[in-house]
Curated annotation (Swiss-Prot):
Propeptide: 127-150
Superkingdom, taxonomy of origin: Eukaryota
Residue numbers spanned by region Disordered: 19-131
Gene Ontology CC: extracellular matrix; plasma membrane; side of membrane
Record key words, sorted: Cell membrane, Glycoprotein, GPI-anchor, Lipoprotein, Membrane, Proteoglycan, Signal
Name of the featured protein: Classical arabinogalactan protein 6
Physiological role: Proteoglycan that seems to be implicated in diverse developmental roles such as differentiation, cell-cell recognition, embryogenesis and programmed cell death. Plays an important role during the formation of the nexine layer of the pollen wall.
Signal peptide: 1-20
Lipid attachment, kind GPI-anchor amidated serine: 126
Biased composition, class Low complexity, residue ranges: 19-75, 85-98
Length: 150
């Protein structure tokens, strides 16, 4: 009777260890996608204030502002907040320039979400197969241990 108890305890520990080893491998796969998406979002957010700085600089000097427009954003670092408010009326003149940086931001986010959805859908299938394998192996091992412990 004591041998059966020891065998049962060892079997339980073995299966618990196998499940514990399988569970952490699924968690890190889910974590990088959300981590990658916020990393991309602030980068795009940093680019977005630069674009509104270009639009207001071009609005007052619309005819001869091609070269100064490029130099103005570099010179006007702390002023983008004021320029951003002023860019609303002149947004129609530079709409393609301002619209371009926000467009890649949603694309990058959706691209990050797309691959994360794919592996997430595959992970439960792999987990279900792994669980089924553990169930079959555990049942066979239990029957074998009890059979040989008598």
């Amino acid at each position: 009777m004591a041998r059966q108890f020891v065998v049962l305890v060892l079997l339980t520990l073995t299966i618990a260890t196998a499940f514990a080893a399988d569970a952490p491998s699924a968690s890190p796969k889910k974590s990088p996608s959300p981590t990658a998406a916020p990393t991309k979002a602030p980068t795009a957010t940093t680019k977005a204030p630069s674009a509104p700085t270009k639009a207001p600089a071009a609005a007052p000097k619309s005819s001869s502002a091609s070269s100064p427009k490029a130099s103005s954003p570099a010179a006007e670092g702390p002023v983008p907040e004021d320029d951003y408010s002023a860019s609303s009326p002149s947004d129609s003149a530079e709409a393609p320039t301002v619209s371009s940086p926000p467009a890649p931001t949603p694309d990058s986010t959706s691209a990050a979400d797309g691959p994360s959805d794919g592996p997430t859908a595959e992970s439960p299938k792999s987990g279900a197969v792994t669980t089924a394998k553990f169930s079959v192996v555990g049942t066979v091992a239990t029957v074998g241990f009890f059979f040989f412990s008598f």
